[in-house]
Amino acid sequence: MSIKPVVALIGRPNVGKSTLFNQFTKSRQALVADLSGLTRDRQYGDATYEDKAFIVVDTGGIGEADDGRGDIDDYMSEQSYTAIHEADIIVFVVDARAGMIGADAEIGKFLHTLGKPVYVVANKVDGVHDSAPAEFYALGLGEPYPMAASHGRGVGNLLEVLTADMPNQENIIEPRGLKLAIIGRPNVGKSTLVNRLLGEDRVVVFDMPGTTRDSIYIPYKRDGKDYVLIDTAGVRRRGKIDEKVEKFSVIKTLQAIEDSNVTVIVIDAHEGIVDQDLHMIGYALDAGRALVVAINKWDGLTADQKNYIKIEMDRRFNFIPYVKVHQISALHGTGVGNLYPSILRAYQSSMFEVSTNRLTQILQDAVTANPPPTVAGRRIKLRYAHIGGHNPPVIVIHGNQTGSLPKSYQRYLENQFRQVFKLEGTPLNVVFKLNENPYANKSDTPTKAKTQQLRQRERNRAQKFTTKDKKPR
């Protein structure tokens, strides 16, 4: 499947994990910088090396103890535990200047128990003897990779090794059907909704939060249409780590969203709409995914509570007026069947096609009804439009002075396209391109070339008449 591998960076504080994270992600901003209610010492980013994509996690929370005593729990936070168990590959960053200390040895022992690929990176080798990394052979995790992450030295070699067995993006086999992701905070009813959508008990449901693990793909048919449900529900029973209740799996949520065509976010009506719900909605929109909102456990509310939630929906969802919101009860099945039409409309909207002629006509109608403003005495001209992509749909508009088009006018055009094509549930990207003169960088413009051609004809004609009029000697 096309789910991205996960690489977790672990190690003591100040060994260079964040610097290596920035090198991997090319200093891009972390995908999730601060999700409400989550430990803030983890960052998540997208990385690509030679067309091989993966998610990189910068973990925190490993202690400074250097006496080598105590259990691994003394050194590692619950969130770091979670990141390590979700990862496909572990990069263990150590400090070549400081040398190996007790905490490094304790973490190394723990990593031996995981059965996952582990790469030891001896960072900060600049200014130390070439033999300094050799000390970390004692960890028993293979050859240490010398690196100076702050200068980028050694990063390329590590990436080449890390990605050697990862699939190329163009070689990934996609499952057949509309890919539907079910996301939401813990215990909002995701697994119950999955069972309702599938119409059978395909997923075990638990009442306590934190019983979710890896995303799984469930292909199924409904009304003759193919679907692939990307579900983050399952059972955690994989050793000591699983005795801890996981608060939230950011990695699996990001993977499910990115790999979906349509995302359904489940919100607990009893808890109301919280910031974490909005963060997940925001990420789905940033990823360009079509969206449907399901307010679950609706039947358990009083009339006053329902009125309050409706007011909250109007207030907190005002930035997504094009997204359909459903009130459902996954447990009893109320309203669940109504999700499918919204899911299909959102998907169709995200993949819509239209001819350039038709799109340009809609553009011209919008411009006629409400012309663009003038800039420096010249009116901005928008000449034609065409489709530039899908999921999310992209409309490309060509014209002059497009860089000066106000945001308010850009939103006006987006709303016009939404209304005409009845786009529901999907972000819409409207991109503006400046018309370029193809002869701008050439010595001859069409006008100049035409002039020279006419002059040459005149010279030829004059020469012809001169020759004709000459008398023979």
Swiss-Prot record:
Keywords: GTP-binding, Nucleotide-binding, Repeat, Ribosome biogenesis. Residues 455-473 have a biased composition (Basic and acidic residues). Residues 352-436 form the KH-like domain. The gene is der. The keyword Cell membrane does not apply. Residues 438-473 are annotated as: Disordered. Residues 5-170, 178-351 form the EngA-type G domain. Belongs to the TRAFAC class TrmE-Era-EngA-EngB-Septin-like GTPase superfamily. EngA (Der) GTPase family. NCBIfam families: GTPase_EngA, small_GTP. Associates with the 50S ribosomal subunit. Pfam families: KH_dom-like, MMR_HSR1. Residues 438-454 have a biased composition (Polar residues). This is GTPase Der. One of its GO terms (molecular function) is GTP binding. One of its GO terms (biological process) is ribosome biogenesis. GTP 2 binds at residues 184-191, 231-235, 296-299. GTP 1 binds at residues 11-18, 58-62, 123-126. InterPro entries: G_ENGA, GTP-bd, GTPase_Der, KH_dom-like, KH_dom-like_a/b, P-loop_NTPase, Small_GTP-bd. GTPase that plays an essential role in the late steps of ribosome biogenesis. The keyword Transmembrane helix does not apply.
